[in-house]
């Protein structure tokens, strides 16, 4: 355990912050004893994987915990699917590649999403028409309220659009591993025209899951900045889900506004990127805080922007969208050290 630990290297925005205590745990079995240390026993706890879905707008209170368990294995084979277990510290993209190498499908649309396996259920990560919740079998976690390890199935995880019980109760559950139910053959999700076009350019009209993954990798590498080069956390805002009546009223005034089906009946989804671009923010930069010129959803740190400066920049983006469209944007990353 380290005291007064710098966190710049542990978040993909590369903002400066300091942890009062930084604790690394390598196995789930070591977790209860580690959490009982007197320095942190009653302190708030922030779990950081790769720090790809947080904005440190200030120093986190209490202790920062890093899980280092990186074991991956197929734990059950069936006729048409397999159960893959991955430790919370496993790199997400590495798991996608592992599943493809084992002849399994389902995760291909989620290739190259930054972060770790332990973080994927929290946000119910999704991209290009797929979300990880469709393939989660069990989440293994330590329940701090009852001081015991628990196994939560997909229903108990309360997975929604960029939401889960882990996001709703961040102080309760510490995810130590995730089990995935992955099919041997899965109907490919090619709803996004960009993926179909990329597959055609690759000469892969009769696509396999590995081809879809490569198409997604190609698209993401073109559109999204590499966080190792330019600080960012991927998409910063959720796509707004609105009642169909409200969307119809908006489309009457803004006829070119794109609309997509929502996850539930009676709801439609707007493109946050389109809203932000229409308000003139795409490519805009103020100091070292800015919006990527390639993708309006991506907030970037060009060098030395603080978390507080990035948060202020994001708030002003959201306020301009609210004023013009009466639509409220919500951030995807968890905001630490400040309120949204």
From Swiss-Prot:
It catalyses: UDP-N-acetyl-alpha-D-muramate + NADP(+) = UDP-N-acetyl-3-O-(1-carboxyvinyl)-alpha-D-glucosamine + NADPH + H(+). Pfam families: FAD_binding_4 (PF01565), MurB_C (PF02873). One of its GO terms (cellular component) is cytosol. Pathway: Cell wall biogenesis; peptidoglycan biosynthesis. Residues 14-185 form the FAD-binding PCMH-type domain. GO terms for biological process: cell division; cell wall organization; peptidoglycan biosynthetic process; regulation of cell shape. It is found in: Cytoplasm. Its main location: cytoplasm. Its cofactor is FAD. Its EC number is 1.3.1.98. SUPFAM superfamilies: FAD-binding/transporter-associated domain-like, Uridine diphospho-N-Acetylenolpyruvylglucosamine reductase, MurB, C-terminal domain. Gene3D superfamilies: 3.30.465.10, UDP-N-acetylenolpyruvoylglucosamine reductase, C-terminal domain, Uridine Diphospho-n-acetylenolpyruvylglucosamine Reductase, domain 2. NCBIfam families: murB, PRK00046.1, PRK13903.1. Cell wall formation. HAMAP family: MurB. Belongs to the MurB family. This is UDP-N-acetylenolpyruvoylglucosamine reductase. It comes from Xanthomonas oryzae pv. oryzae (strain KACC10331 / KXO85).
């Amino acid at each position: 355990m380290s005291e007064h630990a710098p966190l710049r290297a542990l978040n993909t925005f590369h903002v400066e912050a300091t942890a009062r205590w930084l604790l690394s745990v390598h196995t789930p079995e070591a977790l209860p004893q580690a959490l009982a240390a007197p320095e942190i026993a009653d302190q708030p706890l922030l779990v950081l994987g790769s720090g790809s879905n947080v904005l440190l707008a200030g120093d986190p209170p209490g202790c920062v915990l890093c899980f280092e368990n990186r074991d991956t294995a197929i734990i059950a084979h069936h006729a048409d699917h397999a159960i893959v277990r991955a430790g919370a510290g496993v790199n997400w993209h590495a798991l996608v590649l592992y599943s493809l190498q084992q002849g399994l499908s389902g995760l291909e649309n989620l290739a190259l999403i930054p972060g770790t396996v332990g973080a994927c259920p929290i946000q119910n990560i999704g991209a290009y028409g797929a979300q990880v919740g469709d393939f989660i079998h069990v989440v293994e976690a330590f329940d701090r309220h009852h001081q015991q390890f628990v196994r939560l199935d997909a229903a108990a995880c309360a997975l929604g659009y960029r939401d889960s019980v882990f996001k709703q109760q961040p102080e309760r559950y510490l995810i130590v591993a995730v089990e995935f139910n992955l099919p041997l053959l899965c109907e490919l999700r090619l709803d996004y025209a960009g993926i179909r076009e990329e597959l055609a350019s690759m000469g892969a009209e009769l696509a396999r899951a590995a081809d879809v993954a490569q198409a997604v990798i190609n698209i993401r590498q073109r559109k999204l900045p590499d966080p190792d080069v330019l600080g960012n956390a991927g998409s910063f805002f959720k796509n707004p889900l609105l009642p169909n009546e409200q969307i119809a009223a908006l489309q009457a005034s803004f006829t070119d506004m794109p609309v997509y089906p929502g996850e539930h009946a009676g709801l439609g989804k707007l493109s946050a990127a389109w809203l932000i671009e229409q308000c003139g923010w795409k490519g805009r930069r103020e100091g070292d805080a800015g919006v990527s010129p390639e993708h309006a959803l991506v907030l970037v740190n060009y060098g030395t922007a603080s978390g507080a400066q990035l948060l202020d920049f994001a708030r002003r983006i959201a306020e301009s969208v609210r004023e013009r469209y009466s639509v409220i944007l919500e951030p995807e990353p968890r905001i630490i050290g400040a309120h949204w």
